[in-house]
Regions:
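Short microdomains enriched in Cys/His and/or Lys/Arg
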Residues: 20-35, 235
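Alpha-helix N-cap and loop-to-helix initiation/capping positions
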Residues: 21, 54, 58, 118-126, ...
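Short amphipathic alpha-helices and their capping/turn segments at secondary-structure boundaries
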Residues: 29-33, 84-98, 129, 158-168, ...
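Short, small-residue-enriched loops and turns at beta-alpha junctions
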Residues: 50-54, 81-84, 148-152, 180, ...
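Conserved C-terminal portion of the radical SAM core fold
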Residues: 125-184, 200-225
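Auxiliary Fe-S-binding modules of radical SAM enzymes
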Residues: 171, 179-269
Length: 269
């Protein structure tokens, strides 16, 4: 059961302790952020697991507790595209009139054979339906794509990016495939290692992806963080500054920028 690449933390390996109240978790996260940055405003991110999978009354209490804090300026809710029933959509639309509400959907790929392999449990059609329902209610969508899934070529990955570019998506998180200890993907990798991106290959692909996306689309993530204690591969991904610097060099060296090849079918990578 569950997706093939998810750790026991349900993609929330860096989140505050879920045993605390929402207010307590936000306070803990603020302390951590203040050590690194000088930020004064925050986005409340409901990240781990499926954050719309509860009775609507429970969800209302959790979301409004977060939104009630004056320095919380937006709510970002990560969930599955098949866990957005009408009553939850109506709640999100209502809260969106108070402060901006974003919904994050983990599509990962548009290719059905890969969706089956990673055990996503939903289809591309269900994702499209969820985006339409959210868009109709004025709720912004952030879509996650994973680059480097086994069995996919770079052309397959660029096709997923082109698909997002053609749909009403506010933002995107481009995520390098991390192979983690304690996941089914990790077991597969240890038994029969499959090819993973080198730093240069990944940054080359990211430059392509940025060129294909609309200039107004918000890029929320370019690589992602795998928890060091669980990360089997690729180890180069732990040096985030080096990754970002390499992406900048690729863009400059190839004279690329976000949107350069948007709607230009002459570009095929």
């Amino acid at each position: 059961g569950g997706c093939i690449f998810c750790s026991a933390g349900g993609s929330g390996d860096f989140a505050a302790s879920p045993q605390q109240s929402v207010t307590g978790q936000i306070a803990q996260a603020k302390l951590l952020l203040r050590e690194k940055t000088n930020c004064r405003k925050y986005i409340a991110y409901f990240q781990a697991y499926t954050n719309t999978y509860a009775p609507v009354g429970v969800l209302r209490a959790l979301y409004t507790e977060a939104l009630a804090q004056p320095d919380i300026v937006a709510l970002s809710i990560a969930t599955r595209c098949d866990c957005l029933p009408p009553d939850v959509l109506d709640l999100l639309a209502e809260l969106n009139t108070i402060k901006p509400v974003w919904v994050e959907l983990g599509l990962q790929t548009i290719h059905e054979h890969t969706l089956r392999f990673i055990r996503s449990g939903f289809s591309l059609a269900q994702y499209k339906q969820a985006v339409s329902a959210l868009h109709a209610r004025g709720i912004k969508v952030i879509t996650h794509l994973i680059l480097g899934l086994p069995g996919e070529t770079t052309d397959d990955m660029r096709a997923s990016v082109r698909y997002l570019a053609a749909h009403p998506v506010f933002g995107v998180k481009l995520q390098l495939l991390h192979v983690l200890e304690g996941t089914d993907l990790g077991t597969l990798y240890k038994n029969d290692p499959f090819p993973l991106f080198t730093l240069e290959e990944y940054c080359d692909l990211i430059a392509d992806c940025l060129a294909l996306l609309p200039p107004e689309m918000v890029i929320h993530r370019l690589t992602g963080d795998g928890p060091r204690r669980l990360l089997l591969a690729p180890q180069w991904s732990t040096d985030k500054k080096r990754v970002l610097n390499t992406i900048h060099r690729q863009l400059a060296g190839r004279d690329l920028w976000q949107g350069k090849y948007y709607r230009n079918e002459e570009f095929h990578g």
